[in-house]
C-alpha cells in the first residue's frame, strides 16, 4: 500500500466517524416541546443535521429552513425550505434565506420551540446585516485576507448583524431556542461558532475595536457605530448542546491509523498558526524521526490561517502540505497530508493536499518553485500538477481540519 493509499483510507474513516447523524439524534433525546416546532439549520452541515432531526422527530416538526453552502444540500426534507448561499463571503441568497428563517420564527408562543441546528460556515450563510451587503462583503474579505483568526473575525461580524451574537435568540422570544451545535472552533465556544446567533456573547466592543486597529481595517462610520453597540450577555430562553468537535475527528484518525499499523502521537487538537508554519513543523518532525523502527503517525487537529500576499488559488490545508514538501525531500519515505472535514479548502473544489518525499523534486522538475507558489498563495495548480490534491466532495460535516505526518517503518 502506498502512502497516498494510507492517507486516503485514514481520511475516509475519519469522515465517516464524524458524520452528524448519530450525534444529532443523541442530542435530541433531551428535546421536548408542547407546541409547534420550527427547525432552523445553518452551516455547511445544515442539510445532514436537519435530515437527522427529521428522521428522529418527523411530523413533530411543523416548518423550517435549511441554509447551507452552494452544492452542500442533497434534496428535499419533509416540509423544510432548502436554501443554498454564499460562503465564505455572504451574498444576496444568504440574506433571503435568513429573512425566511426570521419570518418562520416571528410571533411564536412560549409553548412553541425553535430547534436550531448550527454548524461551521453559519457566520456567512445566516446573515441579516446592519450595514449594506456590499460593505459587509468588503469587510469580510478584509478579515479573511489579513490573517485574522476565526475568533477575531467573528468578534467583528457579530456586531454588524441582526442575527449574530445572541440576537437571533432575542428575536425568537418568548419561544425557547434549543440549539444543537457541531463545533468548528477550538475549545467549542458557543458564542463564536457561527458567530453565536443563540448564545450570550462574551466578546466586547473594546475587543472588536482592537481587531480593527490590529489589522488596519477600513470601516465606514456606520460600521464603526455598530461595533460600539453591545451584544446580549444573557439569554434565558436559549439552551445549547455541543455534539461534535475536532477532538472526535482526531480520535477517528488516530484509530484508523492504528488499524493500519501506525503508532500515533497526537501533537495537538488545538492547532492555530500560519498554515505554512504548520507544514514546515511537520516536515521538521519527519526529519527528526526519519527511518523509525516502527510506523509512526503524528497528527494535529485545529484550524490554521493564511495571510494572503498573492492572488493565486488555494486554501490553508493545501498550503500546509505544500510547505512541508521541501523538508520531506531526501527522506526514505514520509508523507504529510492536511484536509478540511467539510470537504472544501478555501475557494476551491479540493479538501486539502498531500505531499511525500518525492513531491519537491516533482515540483522542481515541472519548473515550479514551492517558495514562490506560497508567496502567491497558488497551491492548488501546483498540487494539481503533481497529483497532490485531496478531493472528497461536500462531506455533510464540519469539525475543523486535520493534518497528519506518516513515517513508515525503516526497512
Segments predicted by a language model, with ranges:
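Glycine-rich oxoanion-binding loops at beta->alpha junctions
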Residues: 67-111, 152, 156-157
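Active-site segments that bind and position negatively charged phosphate/pyrophosphate groups
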Residues: 261-338, 346-347
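Internal gly/pro-rich beta-alpha loop/helix module
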Residues: 132-218, 227-230
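Short beta-strand segments
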Residues: 40-41, 65-68, 115-120, 179-185, ...
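Internal helix-turn-beta structural module
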Residues: 322-411
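A glycine- and small-aliphatic-rich helix-loop capping segment at beta-alpha/alpha-beta transitions
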Residues: 52-61, 79-82, 102, 106, ...
